[in-house]
Regions:
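HotDog/MaoC-like acyl-thioester-processing domains
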Residues: 1-13, 100-102, 113-184
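A generic structural signal for short beta-strands and their flanking turns/coil linkers
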Residues: 17, 30-32, 42-44, 86-92, ...
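Catalytic strand-loop segment that frames the active site of acyl-thioester-processing enzymes
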Residues: 19-61, 178-184
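Residues located in well-ordered beta-strands
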Residues: 35, 93-95, 107-111, 123-125, ...
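Hydrophobic residues in beta-strands and at strand termini
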Residues: 48-50, 96, 143
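A short beta-loop-beta micro-motif enriched in histidine and acidic residues
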Residues: 61-65, 83
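Short amphipathic alpha-helical face segments that pack within enzyme cores
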Residues: 65-69, 73
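Hydrophobic beta-strand-centered segment that forms part of the acyl-chain substrate-binding groove
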Residues: 73-107, 113
């Protein structure tokens, strides 16, 4: 019987959150309110608990929700290298390995695999508390500055903080996050 080996990866900083984003929005009561972090190894990480309201079957997270979480953590990985740049999804392939329980503390991490000009490819994993990979993804993203995303959405990039777009620190933010060791 094999046991999962874990490593602690240091958190460098929290990442931005939005007021009303479905994944990270702190004001979105119907959302997931996931917290995102930049890690010292260049990856992005997410900590979250999916409420029962987002099930596909009783007690199981809807596949679209877990796919959205993976999409977000991989798209955010570019900001570790380029702080004012965000990944906008072009293509995402998600694989589901195990049922994902609702109302359970979960984690995910995303990484950049290759950067080519204005695009990048990345991958991500969503973990159960015991370190089992419950879902994984690969994707292609376009790099866009947050100012452009805001402008194209009809927002003033200079007032994003007023709409809740900011880095938030919480008293219970981790100094490091425990993840299974990856087989490179």
């Amino acid at each position: 019987m094999s046991s999962t080996e874990f490593e602690l990866i240091k958190v460098i900083a929290p990442q931005h959150t939005s007021g009303n984003c479905f994944i990270c929005g702190v004001n979105n009561q119907a959302g997931l309110q996931a917290r995102f972090y930049e890690l010292e190894n260049g990856e992005a990480a997410a900590l979250f608990t999916v409420p029962e309201a987002h099930n596909g079957y009783p007690g199981r997270v809807h596949g679209g929700v877990s796919g959205a979480l993976l999409d977000e953590v991989v798209g955010r990985a570019i900001t570790v290298m380029e702080p004012d740049t965000w990944g906008v999804t072009v293509e995402l392939h998600t694989r589901y390995h195990k049922p994902i329980p609702t109302e359970t503390p979960l984690s995910a991490r995303g990484r950049i695999e290759k950067v080519k000009g204005r695009s990048f490819t990345g991958s991500g994993d969503l973990y159960l508390p015991d370190g089992t990979v419950a879902a994984s993804c690969t994707g292609t993203y376009v790099k866009l500055p947050i100012e452009r995303i805001a402008t194209e959405s009809g927002k003033d990039p200079h007032t994003l903080a007023e709409e809740g777009w900011m880095k938030r620190s919480y008293a219970d933010d981790p100094e490091a996050i425990r993840f299974p060791k990856r087989n490179e």
